[in-house]
Each structure stands twice: as C-alpha cells, then as structure tokens.
C-alpha cells in the first residue's frame, strides 16, 4: 500500500470561512506599499498581456493591476471571496472563473503572465495537484510568457513534535491564535486561525501543502518552464539561504 496522507481538502473552505474578514485582516493600509510594489513587479512582466491570477480572492492585487490597464482574469474556488471582489470599484473589469486552479482553464488566454501570490499555490492539497497546476499554467502561457509565484520558504523548526500554538496578535478585545499540526512526510500543515472575543469563538481553516523552491523548480522543469528570476521579495531583495519567502519567475520558452 502507498500512503497518500490526508487529502480531504475542500478548495473553497478557506475562502468561504474568511471572506467576511479577509480585507479587514490582509488588505490593510499598512500593506498598501507592498501591494503597489507587487503590482509594479507584475506590470513589468506582463508583456502585452493578458494576465491570469490563480486564487484571485477579493482582488487585492488583481484590481490595482487591472486599474493600471492590464486585462486580468482570475480563478477562485470561493464564491464568497469572488462576491467581495465584484462589490468593489472596478470589480466587473476582472473576469473570474469559479473552480479549482489546479484543474480549470481560464478563458481569454493564452496569457502573457500567470501569477499566484500570498502562498496561495500551497493551498493545493498534494504534490500531484501542484504538478498538474504547473502543467496547466505552462499550457496556458504564450511562448515567452511568465509564471510568477510569491510563497514562503518552509521552516520546519517552527514545529515541536508536529505541532505549534502561536499567539498571532491582540486586536482590541479579540485574541488571534494559530493552532497547527505538521505532517513532514506529506509536507502538510493543517492550521486553524482562532479568534476569541466578545462575539465568541471564530475558526478559520488554513491548510497548506508546502514545497521548497527546489521542488517548485522541478515542477517547473516537468512542465517545460525555466526559472529566470528568484528574489526574496517584490522589491528585488537578493534571495539567500536565510530568506523566509521568495518571488520566483518561470518562463515558457519561445
Ligand atoms: C490567501 S487568499 C489570496 C487571495 C488573493 N490572491 C490575495 O492576494 O489577496 C487565497 C485564495 O485562493 C483561493 N483558493 C484556495 N485554494 C484554491 C483552489 N484550489 N482553487 C481556486 N482557488 C483557491 C481562496 O478561495 C482564496 O480566495
């Protein structure tokens, strides 16, 4: 028997739970400079476009990118996240396909740029889904088109005997905790972001299957893509052995 690990991951679960608070938590004023730099980075790599965002969510990056004149298409599994995007100014400018980005193809291609940010690639539950995603991305790119990914570099020292409980922040009367279980064989971390406050207890699932940059590069090679850039952040910071995140660019050869 070949162990498969726990793959009961619903692609819509994260977004359906978090949609009401996502922008309040992650689309905050202090993050605006980083969004602006990320949009600049993407703008300079989109060529003649169009662009496709995997896991477009509430449009945190897609909307400012579209506002700068790029045609942006998105895929997302969560109807509630997409409803948030639709309600925003410019929301009707971004076409969104509802579905799993490892499986569905978006209309409007081939794309000059496909991108996936904020660790969203790791939402795919296992290596097979991640390999399929790379293959679909490669098939949807124009010759010379680019695939950009922003993701964390795994750090398994975070876990003590396969678990971690972390106080994330105190927000007024509300305490934010993160409770995680780590499976190093399948490279999975199942987490629950818990909020404890006057309104009661909130629980938000965040389940990921992480991969090191070297494994992502191998997925790229399997899909016929070549790594052309790797930075530690959107500002072009050098990527080193101590970097905790990366912005990587793979290219479909001409
Ligand atoms: C962390 S949010 C990022 C949203 C947006 N890209 C941003 O930067 O704010 C992850 C998004 O990916 C979506 N998602 C997660 N797994 C997915 C999958 N397998 N297929 C499609 N969308 C998925 C979620 O619904 C959510 O909207």
Question: Where does each model-flagged region fall?
Answer:
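A short glycine-rich, Lys/Arg-flanked "PGG" loop and its adjoining helix->strand segment in the class I
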Residues: 131-143
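SAM-dependent methyltransferase
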Residues: 148-219
């Amino acid at each position: 028997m070949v162990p498969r690990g726990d793959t009961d991951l619903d692609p819509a679960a994260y977004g359906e739970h978090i949609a009401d608070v996502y922008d309040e938590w992650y689309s905050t004023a202090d993050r605006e400079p980083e969004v602006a730099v990320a949009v600049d980075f993407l703008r300079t790599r989109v060529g003649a476009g169009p662009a496709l965002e995997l896991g477009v969510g509430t449009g945190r990056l897609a909307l400012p990118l579209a506002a700068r004149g790029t045609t942006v298409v998105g895929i997302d599994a969560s109807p509630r996240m997409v409803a948030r995007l639709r309600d925003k100014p410019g929301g009707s400018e971004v076409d969104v396909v509802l579905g799993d980005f490892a499986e569905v193809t978006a209309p409007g291609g081939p794309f000059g740029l496909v991108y996936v940010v904020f660790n969203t690639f790791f939402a795919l539950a296992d290596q097979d889904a991640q390999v399929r995603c790379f293959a679909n991305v490669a098939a949807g790119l124009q010759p010379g088109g680019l695939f950009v990914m922003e993701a964390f570099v795994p750090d398994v020292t975070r876990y003590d005997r396969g678990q971690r409980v972390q106080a994330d922040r105190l927000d007024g009367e509300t305490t934010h905790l993160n409770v995680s279980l780590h499976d190093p064989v399948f490279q999975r971390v199942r987490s629950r972001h818990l909020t404890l406050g006057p309104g009661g207890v909130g629980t938000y699932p965040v389940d990921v299957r992480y991969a090191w940059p070297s494994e992502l590069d191998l997925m790229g090679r399997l899909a016929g893509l070549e790594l052309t850039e790797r930075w530690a952040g959107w500002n072009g910071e050098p990527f080193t052995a101590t970097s905790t995140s990366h912005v990587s660019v793979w290219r479909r050869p001409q």
